[in-house]
């Protein structure tokens, strides 16, 4: 487990240096390990350059997104492959991307639950999925299926317009009995996406998702939900409010999803309203930056040394140096908010907006896992006088999530190929000193 983000003081984080006050007997003890669990609709993003005649041939609508059946997807894929039209094949899926990035950042294990084609040919899209996935991701619990995993075709016309064709294949065929209870005992979080419980009637995926939530609650593992898209929320906002209230600890969303969920156009106000249902909110707001909202114990609150910020809640970041906690674990819970503007004003050229939110969430998950890891290995540390959700403060997690988002925006793939640099360039070094 790498230290989350950068800091001058690392509190004898039990990786490189051990606390010299801990007895030799305890040092000889085997270090406790942890991991993050995620359930995903396993799919591959396939990019290809095509002409308008190709789009018409397959009955697609230029510039729009359409769901296609498996037979049409197979014909389309084979034609693209035979004519060497495919420019990129990336492993995709919101949770797959998030777990991959977590494993790259933390240099530690994550566990993916989902489906995988039992018959994999070299060069096929299932093969590409495995090739593009971090070796620190445990894929041993994937459920084999006879058909294809999901495919999302991004067909790029000569004028640059993107047309999407989505084939779900067998990606929603994950069964409840394929969710192993034993992996939840030492997990730091269970990560889900809203898409999992919104499938066709008869698909087993929603039942499998609820089984995982049941195990997470049994072992006191925080359940994290990423909203996915505003269209999922718009269909039935009240359903999602109830779902968050009943099952979710942490929610990650963008400003559009926040508005669909709460009715508030301002991301800070949306995050504040979401605290009625969950304990911690991560809200990305594009060029405006990133907000966090949550609770902390009143007696453990820490005042910021940074300028107080105006907003729909006056001086909302007053206690952003506090650490997030589950509301029910606090004797006197108080709300805490934090905000950060895009790192370095954002990349000079944004190469890919797909996955920046997943990147921000992977940084938050790393910090949550680091807290679990530190608490298990240095239980008598002053860091654990209260039961906190993260290792770092609201402010520090914002900084870390923001930095990871920047890295994803500046590259083509939503999956990081390497962790953050050990040292920033001299001009950016001050970012971590704030």
Regions found by a protein language model. Name each.
Residues 1-65, 86-90, 109, 115-347, ...:
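Ribokinase/PfkB-type carbohydrate-kinase core domain
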Residues 56-82:
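Active-site gating loops and adjacent loop-to-helix segments of metal-dependent hydrolytic enzymes
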Residues 70-74, 212, 274, 405:
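Hydrophobic alpha-helical packing residues
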Residues 75-86, 106-113:
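Glycine-/proline-rich flexible loop or hinge segments
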Residues 89-111, 358-362:
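Active-site alpha-helical elements of protease catalytic centers
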Residues 100-104, 366-370, 403, 407-410:
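Short glycine/serine- and small hydrophobic-enriched flexible loop segments
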Residues 351-354:
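Short, threonine-centered small-residue motifs that mark membrane-proximal processing/anchoring sites
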């Amino acid at each position: 487990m790498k230290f989350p983000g950068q800091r001058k003081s690392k509190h004898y984080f039990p990786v490189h240096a051990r606390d010299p006050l801990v007895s030799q007997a305890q040092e000889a003890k085997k270090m406790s390990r942890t991991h993050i669990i995620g359930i995903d609709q396993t799919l591959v993003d396939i990019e290809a350059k095509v002409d308008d005649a190709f789009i018409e041939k397959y009955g697609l609508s230029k510039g729009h997104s359409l769901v296609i059946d498996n037979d049409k997807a197979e014909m389309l894929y084979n034609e693209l492959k035979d004519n060497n039209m495919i420019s990129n094949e990336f492993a995709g899926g919101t949770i797959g991307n998030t777990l991959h990035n977590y494993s790259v950042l933390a240099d530690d294990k994550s566990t993916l639950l989902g489906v995988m084609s039992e018959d994999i040919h070299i060069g096929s899209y299932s093969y590409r999925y495995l090739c593009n996935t971090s070796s620190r991701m445990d894929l041993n619990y994937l459920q084999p299926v006879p058909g294809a995993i999901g495919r999302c075709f991004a067909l790029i016309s000569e004028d640059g317009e993107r047309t999407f064709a989505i084939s779900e294949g067998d990606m929603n065929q994950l069964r409840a009995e394929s969710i192993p209870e034993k992996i939840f005992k030492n997990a730091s979080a269970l990560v889900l996406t809203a898409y999992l419980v919104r499938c066709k009637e008869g698909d087993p995926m929603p039942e499998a998702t609820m089984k995982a939530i049941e195990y997470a609650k049994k072992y006191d593992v925080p359940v994290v939900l990423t909203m996915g898209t505003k269209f999922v929320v718009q269909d039935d906002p009240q359903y999602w409010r109830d779902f968050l209230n009943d099952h979710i600890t942490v929610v990650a969303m963008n400003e559009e999803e926040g508005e669909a969920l709460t009715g508030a156009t301002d991301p800070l106000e949306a995050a504040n309203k979401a605290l009625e249902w969950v304990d911690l909110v991560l809200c990305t707001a594009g060029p405006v930056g990133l907000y966090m909202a949550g609770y902390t114990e009143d007696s453990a609150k820490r005042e910021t040394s940074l300028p107080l910020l105006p907003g729909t809640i006056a001086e909302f970041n007053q206690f952003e140096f506090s650490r997030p906690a589950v509301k029910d674990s606090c004797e006197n819970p108080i709300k805490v908010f934090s905000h950060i503007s895009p790192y370095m004003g954002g990349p000079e050229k944004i190469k890919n907006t797909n996955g920046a939110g997943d990147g921000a969430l992977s940084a938050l998950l790393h910090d949550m896992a680091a807290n679990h890891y530190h608490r298990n290995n240095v239980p008598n540390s002053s860091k654990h006088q209260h039961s906190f959700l993260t290792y770092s403060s609201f402010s520090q997690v914002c900084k870390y999530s923001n930095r990871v988002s920047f890295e994803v925006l500046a590259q083509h793939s939503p999956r990081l190929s390497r962790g953050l640099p050990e040292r920033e360039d001299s001009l950016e070094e001050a970012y971590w000193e704030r």
